[in-house]
């Protein structure tokens, strides 16, 4: 059985208190080696304490530490989503309890409250967890695509306040999304002290200028935000995906659930970059086609599930497992 390639990720990060005496931002990353990277992936976490509280820096540090430590202690049988959400939910409850036991129990704006944004990359999938107004971006060409929603409530006079954060209530809603990643993809996590004073194009330009030194790029972004007049703490993290690992069985099933079943194919039809030559086999379970790669003429065989089984989720999961198993077979008697 061939040894699967491990996920390779680089992380650059920097934080500065700026004009404030205390840095209420907190950030961290965990890039484990070997089996743990394969089973749990790489985690990058950012939290921002609220300015009205003198203990929100404690909350931010606790939130980051909890996710970076406790996530890796959850069962390998759990999905990334279940593992991280359980940890964040427990942290939220703990922070809320700390406020209830403190002198600030009647004024939550002075309690153990912070925002949180986390990026966990496992295999070939990025998982995003988010509460508050810190942000996660994906670098898209010369600009940034914002992947998270700011949980802020805007008032008629133009002011706004934080609408959701960790520690405010005993339970909180945690935004989650996942997306496929590939080698060359890059993500940026930032606190509002940065993204409210740095246009997306300037962030991308700083990364390009200092490449491949991501720490230098992060320092440059923070410094520019402060020079642009940011009055807040400034923190940025840059995540570069250098190599993705093959998806495990649970990831492939998760990805499968987001795809539509292909229709019945016919000769000369284009499908996923190939041209169908003819049908080789058909049954109530699946269809098998001979196809060629335009430009090279290379022949391939494509197998698709029958549309008659599109509601049979268990069958579709088993269908996906065929590819997962085939990748792990290394035999001269098996066609690859």
Model-derived regions, located:
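PP2C/PPM-type serine/threonine phosphatase catalytic domain
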Residues: 1-301, 305-321, 328-332
């Amino acid at each position: 059985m061939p040894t699967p390639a491990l996920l390779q990720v680089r992380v650059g990060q920097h934080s500065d208190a700026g004009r404030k005496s205390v840095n209420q931002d907190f950030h961290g990353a965990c890039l484990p080696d070997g089996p743990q990277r394969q089973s749990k992936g790489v985690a990058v976490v950012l939290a921002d304490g609220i300015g009205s509280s003198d203990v929100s820096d404690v909350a931010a540090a606790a939130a980051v530490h909890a996710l970076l430590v406790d996530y890796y202690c959850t069962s390998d049988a759990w999905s990334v989503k279940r593992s991280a959400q359980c940890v964040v939910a427990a942290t939220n409850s703990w922070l809320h309890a700390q406020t209830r036991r403190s002198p600030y129990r009647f004024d939550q704006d002075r309690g153990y409250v912070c925002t949180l944004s986390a990026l966990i990359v496992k295999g070939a999938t990025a998982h995003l967890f988010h509460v508050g107004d810190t942000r996660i971006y994906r670098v898209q060409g010369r600009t940034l695509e914002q992947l998270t929603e700011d949980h802020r409530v805007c008032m008629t006079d133009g002011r706004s306040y934080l609408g959701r954060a960790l520690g405010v209530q005993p339970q909180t809603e945690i935004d989650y999304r996942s997306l496929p990643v590939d080698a060359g993809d890059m993500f940026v996590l930032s606190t509002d002290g940065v993204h409210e004073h740095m246009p997306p194009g300037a962030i991308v330009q700083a990364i390009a200028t200092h490449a491949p030194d991501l720490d230098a790029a992060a320092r440059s972004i923070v410094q520019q935000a402060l020079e642009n007049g940011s009055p807040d703490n400034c923190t940025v993290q840059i995540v570069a995906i250098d190599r993705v690992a093959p998806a495990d069985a649970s990831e492939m099933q998760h990805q499968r659930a987001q795809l539509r079943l292909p229709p019945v194919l016919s000769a000369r039809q284009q499908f996923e970059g190939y041209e169908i030559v003819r049908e080789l086999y058909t049954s109530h379970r699946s269809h098998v086609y001979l196809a060629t790669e335009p430009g090279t003429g290379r022949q391939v065989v494509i197998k698709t599930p029958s549309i008659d089984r599109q509601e049979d989720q268990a069958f579709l999961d088993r269908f996906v497992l065929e590819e997962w198993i085939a990748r792990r077979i290394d035999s001269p008697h098996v066609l690859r």
